[in-house]
């Protein structure tokens, strides 16, 4: 199981084996985080590429 942490303040947000789409607001720093296509053993074929996009409204995509 993988620990998912906020990239801004490093707070543990949740633990998961895999997921397709997660939207969460960090309870500590209030940053809005969107995570797409992550799995325990990521491959481009099964999980897609992970990328980080930062917007002016403090939304972060991984």
From Swiss-Prot:
Pfam assignment, any one: Zn_ribbon_Com
Mutation effect (residue 26 to S): Loss of transactivation ability
Cell membrane is among the record's keywords: no
GO terms of molecular function: zinc ion binding
GO-annotated cellular components: host cell cytoplasm
Induction: Expressed in the late phase of the viral replicative cycle. Expression of late genes is activated by the viral late transcription activator C.
Keywords recorded for this protein, A-Z: Activator, Host cytoplasm, Late protein, Metal-binding, Transcription, Transcription regulation, Zinc, Zinc-finger
Cofactor note: One Zn(2+) per molecule.
Protein's cellular compartments: Host cytoplasm
ZnF segments: Atypical: 6-29
Effect of substituting residue 39 to S: No effect on transactivation ability
Family, as annotated: Belongs to the com family.
Function: Trans-acting positive regulator required for mom mRNA translation. Binds the com-mom mRNA 5' and destabilizes a translation inhibition stem to expose mom translation start signals.
Protein name: Translational activator com
Origin organism lineage: Viruses, Duplodnaviria, Heunggongvirae, Uroviricota, Caudoviricetes
UniProt gene name: com
């Amino acid at each position: 199981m993988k620990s998912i942490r906020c990239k801004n303040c490093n707070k543990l947000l949740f633990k998961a084996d895999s997921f397709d789409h997660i939207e969460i607001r960090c309870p500590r720093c209030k940053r809005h985080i969107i995570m797409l296509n992550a799995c325990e053993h990521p491959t481009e074929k099964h999980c897609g590429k992970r990328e980080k996009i930062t917007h002016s409204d403090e939304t972060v995509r991984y």
